[in-house]
Amino acid sequence: MDTEDLPANNAPLTVNEQLLGSCTLKFPAQDAQVIVMSGQETIRVLEVEVDTALSSAGAAESGGDEEGSGQSLEATEEAQLDGPVTTSSTTAVTVEVSAPVVQTVVSKAAISVSPAQQTSVPITVQACPQVLTQDGLASLMTGMLAQQSSLGQPLLIPLSMAGSVGGQGGLAVLTLPTATVATLPGLAAASPAGGLLKLPFAGLQAATVLNSVQTQLQAPAQAVLQPQMSALQAMQQTQTTAATTASIVQKASEPSVSVATLQTAGLSINPAIISAASLGAQPQFISSLTTTPIITSAMSNVAGLTSQLITNAQGQVIGTLPLLVNPASLAGAAAASALPAQGLQVQTVAPQLLLNSQGQIIATIGNGPTAAIPSTASVLPKATVPLTLTKTTTQGPVGKVAPSKVIIAPQPSVVKPVTSLTAAGVIACGEMPTVGQLVNKPSAVKDEEAINLEEIREFAKNFKIRRLSLGLTQTQVGQALTATEGPAYSQSAICRFEKLDITPKSAQKLKPVLERWLAEAELWNQKGQQNLMEFVGGEPSKKRKRRTSFTPQAIEVLNTYFEKNSLPTGQEITEIAKELNYDREVVRVWFCNRRQTLKNTSKINVFQSQ
């Protein structure tokens, strides 16, 4: 196509490369094209501004011209030679985009822009480490094509946005990790000459609810959203910041042309779908999406939609499809009436976190604040569903004007719910609290509320005093109670009861038995100490022998004999015992212990030498 076929009022192409690596590309609004520019290593910031200083009549003429809407990118670049080209940079900037990369959807519906407003439509691509290649970026920016489905035409990413946000224009953020795109099966086959990124989203036509639009002019919709996404703590807070935006008037050039509006708005794809391969997704992820429709249920009405599950060929759940409905269709237009514009609806998304097996956050579902969204969006006649590939990050304020969206959020790993465990006092989980712990921490009493812990503590204190006043030991009390009550009332039980190192139920069981026995022992003590000993019983007949202590001289003699012979005979042991004036059994045991000590020491040295 020659350059003279272009409209005379085309705006010049301005390429500005700033210090931050951003480029500003301007092109006419009626040319439905996308200019993509990227570096070798990183994605630079692209700002595509639409020069709206066009008359409505000129826009209508260019919209009716079939050749004007289907012109290629090379023709646009040649047309810019007539106008001034401004480059503010110390380095050269080269734009290399082949003709097949840019896909144009022919539209017979004219789009007239109000000449009174200057509308800029920037697309900011945030740079991230090791980002997309030139071919991948061009493919992502030009659109998506469904494999073997009714979407037989390439779809342009809709870029038209009303007005400016905060004086900088509405932002449509595209941030994608680079390295993972090449690892996905079916996505690496894009030819360098300009193949499209083909994402097989079959059955997306079921997600649209289309209504015919009257040929007269629609009321202008004014909307802006400036969500503040600063930190992870603020993800659960939603807020709406509304401002006045420029009005865009859309009309049909021919009354016979049926223009459709998409009520469910566009399609927002979570970028985690791109990095699904690196996070453990199955290779059949893409093929499963092709063979299995994403949306299986009929959508006669937007309200009442439920989430859908996306599974691979093995039946494993790899993603969910939460369909976000407009609250205005359920609870009325009360929220929308508070906004300055009539055609606005408010959508609230509750944030959810997706964690991998290592506990790292890999994606968020619906982490955007409350958004003021236009209720209708125009759709090109040949495009069934407009697709918008976006990603919202928490690095800064990002504004996105989009209708109610369908979010595809794959789940490479199981979502781990975060639970908080509260420990009552110093009581560890899985352990029964003792009486002492419960008395010191009254708030920890649960099932023991019916037990008077203070009474048990006072009784344990008095029981010890009364036992000592009778001259009885814990062993004597335990022996007497074991003979009459059973082994549960041994000396160790008496010791733990006096120290309150016992559970409330056990203490409640011991208390009446100890109280009855102590009262009876005091009665026997009044009759005489001898009667008390008869009642209690003598000390256990089996006593532990007194530990033998060797003098340093005896130890030296024993070590000397041990160095000569570590295993003496019985006669030698008897002679050594007579010499040292010790019992023969004591000397024999010493030699046994000394040999065992040497054996254990030798084992330790062997391990240390290794």
Curated annotation (Swiss-Prot):
Coiled coil: none annotated. Keywords: DNA-binding, Homeobox, Nucleus, Transcription, Transcription regulation. Disulfide bonds: none annotated. SUPFAM superfamilies: Homeodomain-like (SSF46689), lambda repressor-like DNA-binding domains (SSF47413). Residues 543-602 bind DNA. Pfam families: Homeodomain, Pou. GO terms for biological process: atrioventricular canal morphogenesis; regulation of transcription by RNA polymerase II. Transmembrane segments: none annotated. Its main location: nucleus. It is found in: Nucleus. Ubiquitously expressed during embryogenesis. Residues 448-522 form the POU-specific domain. InterPro entries: HD (IPR001356), Homeodomain-like_sf (IPR009057), Lambda_DNA-bd_dom_sf (IPR010982), POU (IPR013847), POU_dom (IPR000327), POU_domain_TF (IPR050255). Residues 55-87 are annotated as: Disordered. One of its GO terms (cellular component) is nucleus. GO terms for molecular function: DNA-binding transcription factor activity, RNA polymerase II-specific; RNA polymerase II cis-regulatory region sequence-specific DNA binding. Belongs to the POU transcription factor family. Class-6 subfamily. Transcription factor that binds with high affinity to the motif 5'-TAATGARAT-3'. This is POU domain, class 6, transcription factor 1. It comes from Danio rerio (Zebrafish).
